[in-house]
Amino acid sequence: MGDLKGSRKRKAVTRDLDEEPGVVSGDELNLDALDGDLSDKSHDTEHSSDSEIELVDDLSSDDGEEYEDEFDSDEIPSDIESKPIREKSKPDRGVDIFVRGEEVTSDGELGDGYDDDKLNYRVTKDANGNERYIYDEINPDDNSDYSEADENANTIGNIPLSFYDQYPHIGYNINGKKIMRPAMGQALDTLLDSIELPKGFTGLTDPSTGKPLELNQDELELLRKVQMNEITEDGYDPYQPTIEYFTSKLEIMPLNAAPEPKRRFVPSKHEAKRVMKLVKAIREGRILPYKPLTEKAEAEEGVWTYDLWANETPRADHPMHIPAPKLPPPGYEESYHPPPEYLPDEKEKAAWLNTDPEDREREYLPADYDALRKVPGYDSFVKEKFERCLDLYLAPRVRRSKLNIDPESLLPKLPSPEELKPFPSTCATLFRGHSGRVRTLAIDPTGVWLASGGDDGTVRVWELLTGRQIWSVKLSDEEPVNVIRWRPSKDAVVLAAATGDSIHLIVPPILDPEMEKASLDIVDAGWGYAKTLTSDSTKKTSAQWTRPSPSLLDSGVQAVISLGYVAKSLSWHRRGDYFVTVCPGTATPVSLAIAIHTLSKHLTQHPFRRRLKGGGPPQAAHFHPSKPILFVANQRTIRSYDLSRQSLVKILQPGARWISSFDIHPTSSTTSGGDNLIVGSYDRRLLWHDVDLSPRPYKTLRYHQKAIRAVRYHSNYPLFADASDDGSLQIFHGSVTGDLLSNASIVPLKVLRGHKVTGELGVLDLDWHPREAWCVSAGADGTCRLWT
């Protein structure tokens, strides 16, 4: 018996069994093991080739799949074992047909249990006398894919009807007969057909028949559904309830617990290779994104391009045309996600809201958003654009020529600080001993001794190099020592100290006997002259030259000048016979604020009888180093007076709010050909004045954070320095040449920091060494420092 699965013969009419028997394929079926024999009822010796009927099921159908599942068992059902089966080796020609467990005889009659069903075939004899099974034609019902063929249908296939234009027929039907060409309607019939359109009229011609193409009701309904974008299938529900296959039931274990493969999150190297091939082809020009059209292709497509502005001549702008200024580019604060430092806090937001719109710095408040899609509309957009339009057509425009100059070329070429050495850079010696602030200090003309005075009312003399205290004297228990200065001449050593309303002239007992005797003679020479002058003079002065008390006399104090008012400034003349004092107090009378004292005569003079016009009370005064000129500074101006002519020479206007100190260049009018001075102010300014150049400052330096207390020139080196309340000293190089056409050059050199800021006060005074590039500073922290 042949293989059941490989057969594709016609299926016999069968009837389902109550129990589905097991069937095994021919490869697995052992015919020798069967107990039953083939039945031998009739036709035992007839036609061995046709004696066997293969009953085959279509295994590709659904029934076949069910049978495969049912016949997987290795056991042979008892129903089949009980049926007689004919073996191939037996010569019996009789055929017993078993259709799904029912017996069919060779005469075409059903066995037991199959009397009610009708066979779909009949058995006849062929030309050789063998049996022949003739099956009935299949009459398809409505559910069948088979349909009756239209005998009048044209069977020419896809051949165009134009091939039959020369023939009276248009094709052949299924029986091979010619299909004659339909009669053509007259013009009147065509008009009537166009007026009264039949149902299903399309206006088209059926290519297979040549007749007008008409659609039936089903086809019209199909077209309507397609036109209305509806589902063409009848009974289709597009909104069927969703069946949740996985989420409807709670799963304890995962459906698939396999780990994610590496290819899920690693870029594919094969795709990378293919992409690199495409990139290489694009770079080499073998792949073009848009294939350019050739002239021939453009001509075939009928595309012609014309340049509308080929013959257009450019029109010149108006001579007075000025383009509109561009808007400034947006800043960080206009970003939808600005840095945190650009976002205002609650206090800044409240201040912005309380400010008038005209006084606000910007028209908006920076805001932070996570994404650009969350940024709302700008409510002032229309207003901003409207104001921009107003500015464009209402505001006048001015064309300004822009100079293309390198900013660095405008800066002076300053030398390197390394080329300008020597200058002080480090702290060499620290002087400790005062209790309280050290207000003033000075180095003697020999450069060996340092004198200092402070709030404790004492004057101390130190050895400059070692920092050892040599001598001290207490001048007052209540008043501080405001100013202390050495006599500039080297033939005698006299120290002038201003304490309260008195000036003490001191000869420290630290000198050799000859120098000490010469110093005492200079101070004592004026006592007899002062006595004679007082007896002969009719004018009375408030300043009194007196001898000190025995205790002060033993300490080295040789004379005391009582001014009656507190002196804050003291300056010697270059010859050492005159010194000027200034009492800047508001209670000081105008005529007594400035006093010039003569050491050799013990004489005090008040050169100013009237108040200086403008600028407030006087602050400091200095003698010119080579001319009989006195410079007097009040709060806002500096005046120079010729003492020989008793006239005003010049008024300098530094522009500072409150002048604290000033100093005159030591080589003024000798080698430089002009006067130069520096001015320090409480508003943190350091000003350089060239007197011959202008009454205004030549340079203004703003390097300090707090008020400047003192400024000083070096006597031999082109150096000057200033001291500030921020606890620092700044060293500058200032060179002055004799060429009147060249200006002074100023180079910042060094910032010296070491003093502590105490009570909002830092460095109160400074002085230069007469020979070396050293300077000393006095601080509010109670120390003095030597910078070398």
UniProtKB/Swiss-Prot annotation:
Q: Which organism is it from?
A: Ajellomyces capsulatus (strain NAm1 / WU24) (Darling's disease fungus)
UniProt subcellular location: Nucleus, Nucleolus; Nucleus, Nucleoplasm
Q: What is its main location?
A: nucleus
Function text: Component of the NOP7 complex, which is required for maturation of the 25S and 5.8S ribosomal RNAs and formation of the 60S ribosome.
Query: What's in the keyword line of the UniProt record?
Result: Nucleus, Repeat, Ribosome biogenesis, rRNA processing, WD repeat
- GO MF terms, alphabetically ordered: ribonucleoprotein complex binding
Q: Where is this region: Disordered?
A: 1-91
Q: Has the keyword Oxidoreductase been applied to this entry?
A: no
**Lineage, please?**
Eukaryota, Fungi, Dikarya, Ascomycota, Pezizomycotina
What are the GO cellular component annotations?
nucleoplasm; PeBoW complex; preribosome, large subunit precursor
Q: What is this protein called?
A: Ribosome biogenesis protein ERB1
Acidic residues bias spans = 51-78
- Family, as annotated: Belongs to the WD repeat BOP1/ERB1 family.
Q: Where is the composition biased (Basic and acidic residues)?
A: 38-50, 80-91
Q: Name one GO biological process term.
A: maturation of LSU-rRNA from tricistronic rRNA transcript (SSU-rRNA, 5.8S rRNA, LSU-rRNA)
UniProt WD repeat ranges: 433-472, 476-516, 613-651, 654-699, 703-742, 758-788
PANTHER family in the record = RIBOSOME BIOGENESIS PROTEIN BOP1, RIBOSOME BIOGENESIS PROTEIN BOP1 BLOCK OF PROLIFERATION 1 PROTEIN
Per UniProt, subunit arrangement is: Component of the NOP7 complex, composed of ERB1, NOP7 and YTM1. The complex is held together by ERB1, which interacts with NOP7 via its N-terminal domain and with YTM1 via a high-affinity interaction between the seven-bladed beta-propeller domains of the 2 proteins. The NOP7 complex associates with the 66S pre-ribosome.
